[in-house]
Amino acid sequence: MSEAKKYVMTYEGVKKLEEELEFLKTVKRKEITEKIKVALSFGDLSENSEYDEAKNEQAFVEGRIIQLENMLKNASIVDENEVPKDVVSVGSIVKVKDYEFDEEVEYIIVGSAEADPMNNKISNESPVGHGLIGKKAGDIIEVAVPDGVSKYEILEVNRA
């Protein structure tokens, strides 16, 4: 049997997933149980859209709970004290110059479970994140992205 996938995460990321898991188990499950009770009170289940919707929501939430439990069970937490502060790793805040758009961008490197590109949290497994890992300020990298190659210069490396 193959080994379970390890999820590289920061302490902050683990805490966030634990909070989501707790919310789903305590609050959301109760809400859905109540919705199912109300829907059952309507009688005939064959055309009961409220019941179908509540059961679908229940399936989604239970699936997410299983996913979160698996991610937390297989979490590999990055000890930021073990990584030099000037080297890009998970937990680093990296300021880069994006040559394609001629702008400075700041990324936070996180594990794939924590990625949130809209908030500049990029995964260490993404093309750009992977290209930055192990590099230092002053390094220039070229990264293959879906629409070609992007070039970045690392301006600063800090810790979150």
Curated annotation (Swiss-Prot):
One of its GO terms (biological process) is regulation of DNA-templated transcription elongation. It holds the Pfam family GreA_GreB_N. GO terms for molecular function: DNA binding; RNA polymerase binding. Residues 12-76 form a coiled coil. The keyword Magnesium does not apply. InterPro entries: GreA/GreB_C_sf, TF_GreA/GreB_CS, Tscrpt_elong_fac_GreA, Tscrpt_elong_fac_GreA/B, Tscrpt_elong_fac_GreA/B_C, Tscrpt_elong_fac_GreA/B_fam, Tscrpt_elong_fac_GreA/B_N, Tscrpt_elong_fac_GreA/B_N_sf. Keywords: Coiled coil, DNA-binding, Transcription, Transcription regulation. NCBIfam families: greA, PRK00226.1-2, PRK00226.1-4. Belongs to the GreA/GreB family. Necessary for efficient RNA polymerase transcription elongation past template-encoded arresting sites. The arresting sites in DNA have the property of trapping a certain fraction of elongating RNA polymerases that pass through, resulting in locked ternary complexes. Cleavage of the nascent transcript by cleavage factors such as GreA or GreB allows the resumption of elongation from the new 3'terminus. GreA releases sequences of 2 to 3 nucleotides. This is Transcription elongation factor GreA. The gene is greA.
